[in-house]
Amino acid sequence: NGTGKTTLLKILNRVVSADSGTYTLGSNVKIGYYDQEHHVLHMEKTIFDEISDDYPTLTNTEIRNVLAAFLFTGDDVFKQISSLSGGERGRVSLAKLMLSEANFLILDEPTNHLDIVSKEILENALNDYTGTVLYVSHDRYFINQTASRILDLVNHTFVNYIEVLRSEERRVGKECRSR
């Protein structure tokens, strides 16, 4: 905590500017961003309207099918965003993100506030996703289910997590041998 992970994601998404350094994204990269506070949601709208207003070419049936995949069925789709729990807002944000044409998803703590079933939906959606995904998470189970590569931010530098594990194993081994 406090190492700048969220700030880095915001820089990559151009929400904030970097103090120094540069980065370049490919010319065809379209970013989809998921933040912990769900700033993309409009509190005064219903779940259904939140999707239909952003994706007006979708039919009512298509919208209901997408929302059902994120556990919103029947009259639930007409609940106002402001009345939803954190986990429910997370599911709406994820539904919007998966509908976007983004080919690079940036997710900040995507499993926060999600129940087990919602986490499984997210895991399946990410595992089926064909683009690039960069996320910050402390949820070890989620990481194990979805990550193909793990980086650790140590002293403002990314380190391959496999190397971090090996270093820790060597340290523990030395401690055990010295006893």
Where are these regions (language model features)?
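ABC ATP-binding cassette signature C-motif
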Residues: 1-171, 179
